[in-house]
A protein has these predicted regions:
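Cytosolic regulatory regions of ion transport systems
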Residues: 1-161
Length: 161
């Protein structure tokens, strides 16, 4: 699968996982994995490779995902057990960057403890971004840096023109 592009594995093809796999496939080589045949069939023509597997099974996962992957994204938020086991397995395989979707702060803490390099809360992050844009119509975009610090792209008010 290697062509000089980043090699990314996306595990879990629900709403978030399928969207990120499609976006990444435009610039990276994507291996998309899910236990649902229906979900895999919906994306098979839009990524470089899509397979039906149970990511909780170390033997199966390690036969497909090798340490030469640049990154893995675990989007199994609806099943805490599956996301924790999958993250642990990816760490054992030797994946250096593992981004895992979490549903609670405790879930995120466990994911980090077993090997996730970053935990993500897509719904929370989208809600924060939308709320900031609604509260400040001049806000074009922002990047949170830390708890109380952000880089913001703000349009000047009309009175500045």
């Amino acid at each position: 699968m290697r062509s000089g592009q980043k090699l990314i594995c996306v595990i879990g093809l629900g709403q978030f996982g399928s969207h990120i796999a499609r976006e990444l496939a435009q610039h990276c080589e994507v291996l998309a994995l899910d236990s649902s045949e229906k979900r895999v069939n919906l994306i098979v023509d839009e990524v470089q490779r899509a397979l039906i597997i149970d990511a909780r099974d170390f033997q199966t996962l390690s036969s497909l995902v090798t340490p030469d992957f640049d990154e893995a994204i675990v989007s199994l938020g609806e099943s805490m057990e599956a996301s924790i086991l999958c993250t642990l397995h990816l760490k054992r395989i030797g994946i250096k960057t593992i981004r895992a979707k979490a549903v609670t702060e405790d879930h995120a803490a466990i994911l980090r403890a077993v090997g996730a390099t970053e935990t993500i809360f897509p719904e929370r992050e989208t809600a924060q971004r939308l709320a900031a844009q609604i509260a400040n119509p001049n806000l074009l975009d922002f990047i949170p840096l830390a708890e109380d610090f952000r880089v913001m792209d703000v349009a000047p008010p009309d009175s500045f023109h």
